[in-house]
Design a protein with these regions (language model features):
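Aromatic "clamp/platform" in nucleotide-sugar-dependent glycosyltransferases that forms part
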Residues: 273
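Donor nucleotide-sugar binding/catalytic pocket of nucleotide-sugar-dependent glycosyltransferases
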Residues: 28, 44-47, 123, 127-176
Length: 368
């Protein structure tokens, strides 16, 4: 992806690896080839096709140029964040005795279910994929216990857990602006925020379902959507036809502006049922904004008591919003920040480097 949680995680991990004295090289798919030195290390882009219907996702589909690049780079560690098109890299690394780690950024059966594959068939397909991955890679890194379950199910012994993190300096409660909140709320009493890719597996329609349910119950609520994707046209059309007060901002590339939005909102919605961590929800918590998250995902494990886990319906998400709004505002915002402070990037980088059995970074502390 060109944006979103995975891109954020790769950038933050790269900066952490660099600060710990390593020489990280990130290889990503893109439209054209490039090779840049950045604050997260060296970033090499290889041309990769766009997956139809995903609204911009690209993959490293051509093995020959990537294999040649890996041979030229001669890495002493390999970390892979694509469990589909790059599965072959585990065997490549084994043959060369290079310790390789695969990071499970999503559950295979969870993604298959969101695409409509029946539960048992999804589990069987996921088990086949995961057995091969567990054999091919020295370690499998899962960011939550929830993500780890599908590997526990097959008896994998090389699974370690390493949570992701959040930028506690950029994402902070002090960014909350009553002026911005009033402008985005457009006269409503409650401002909801959805920061998500607008694609099938993220279930963004649940946010509109919740908004409609809350308004039917007499609450003056509006919704801001920060994100883009293939479902955007249908969501915009629905909001217009049902006269729902929704602002579609599209992709917000300015991370500072996004943090301002996350701090201004009263509640953040995270309806994706296959999320293995949910960085945008964690960023909202760091800004002091509580979260209603899908009970089917890993997010209840991340948000804890600072949020509400809801079944995957608009009515249940609306109930979760009401539950959070019933808590005193100072208490719910303080609880959100306190929860986020358990997930700083320094701890994340330390855990990932430990999975690689590599040199660890020096201590750091996040700001408020």
């Amino acid at each position: 992806p060109s944006s979103g949680g995975l891109r954020t995680a790769l950038a933050e991990l790269g900066r952490g690896y660099l600060a710990a004295g390593h020489e990280p090289v990130l290889v990503v798919p893109g439209e054209v080839e490039s090779d840049r030195l950045t604050d997260q290390g060296r970033v090499i882009t290889l041309p990769g096709p766009e997956i139809v219907g995903t609204g911009g996702y690209r993959v490293l589909a051509r093995r020959r140029p990537l294999r040649q690049l890996l041979e030229d780079l001669a890495p002493d560690r390999l970390e892979v964040s694509d469990r589909t098109t790059l599965r072959w890299t585990g065997e490549w690394a084994r043959r060369r005795r290079i310790p390789a780690v695969m990071v499970s950024h999503e559950t295979a059966d969870g993604v298959l279910r969101t695409w409509g594959v029946p539960e048992q068939a999804a589990a069987r397909a996921a088990d086949r994929l995961n057995r091969h991955s567990a054999w091919a890679y020295a370690r499998i890194v899962c960011t939550t216990e929830w993500a780890e379950r599908e590997f526990v199910r097959i008896g994998a012994q090389n699974v370690v857990r390493a949570p992701l993190g959040v930028d506690l300096r950029r994402c902070r409660p002090g960014r909350r602006s009553t002026v911005l909140r009033a402008r985005q709320a457009a006269g409503a009493d409650v401002l909801l925020l959805l920061c998500s890719r607008l694609s099938v597996e993220k279930r963004p329609g649940t946010a509109l379902d919740a908004l409609a349910a809350l308004r039917e119950q007499g609450l003056r609520v509006s919704l801001v959507v920060a994100g883009d994707g293939p479902l955007k046209p249908s969501l915009v059309r629905r909001a217009r036809e049902e006269r729902l007060p929704v602002q579609f901002l599209g992709h917000v590339p300015d991370r500072e502006a996004l943090a301002d939005l996350q701090a201004a909102a009263d509640v953040c919605l995270a309806p994706g049922p296959a999320e293995t961590f949910g960085l945008s929800a964690l960023e909202a918590l760091a800004c002091g904004t509580p979260v209603v998250a899908s009970a089917s995902s890993a997010l209840p494990e991340v948000v804890g008591d600072a949020g509400v886990a809801a079944a995957d319906t608009g009515e249940d998400f609306a109930r979760g919003v009401r539950d959070l709004l019933a808590r005193p505002e100072p208490a719910r915002r303080e609880a959100a920040r306190a929860r986020a402070e358990l997930f700083d990037w320094h701890r994340s980088v330390t855990a990932f480097l430990a999975a690689h059995e590599a040199a660890l970074p020096v201590a750091d502390r996040g700001g408020r």
